[in-house]
From Swiss-Prot:
Classification via NCBIfam families: L9
PANTHER family, alphabetized: 50S RIBOSOMAL PROTEIN L9 (PTHR21368)
Function recorded in the entry: Binds to the 23S rRNA.
Gene Ontology biological process terms in this record: translation
UniProt KW Disulfide bond keyword: no
Bias kind Basic and acidic residues: ranges: 173-184
Family: Belongs to the bacterial ribosomal protein bL9 family.
Location of region: Disordered: 156-184
Protein's UniProt name: Large ribosomal subunit protein bL9
Keyword Heme attached: no
One Pfam short name: Ribosomal_L9_N
Amino acid sequence: MLIILKENITTLGKLGEVVKVKPGYARNFLFPQKKAMKATKENLIKLEEQRLLLEEENTKKLNAAKVLASSLHDKFIILIKQASEDGKIFGSVTTREIAKTLLQEGYDISHHSLSLGGISIKNLGEYQVNIELHSKVIVPITIYVVRSEKDAHELRQAKLQNQKSEQQEAEQDASKEAADADDS
């Protein structure tokens, strides 16, 4: 099926390009997400008329993605899963589960935007997940899979302590630089 892209999509092409995709992908993902439209003569003419508006809309989406990316910077998620003694969890962690957790924390991100990097999360531990907020904005977040609420609480406390010490170090470095600048 031939479609016209209404925004830049890294795996397909740029805004306004006519590309061929499988009909199910177009019907079930691209059209409902308003990322593409059918490639008809009428739509091609309409696209040329709307090109500036679409580029402006794309710029707004990019700016919104950058703002969201800054709030997600250094973000981590803790998931509690039942696991065997050797650390294998029962089932696996999915992008839908991660998206649901992000939603509970106030971030409305589609599971389609999450990338596990081709791995399956089936063990306790730390994992890196990429969130594609825009074709030009990809944010990494850290996922911790732990066995119990107690482990999650300990991890949160350790992370908060680590962030406080990093912040104090940064403040000390800034005050030293200011003092050095005053001495010059």
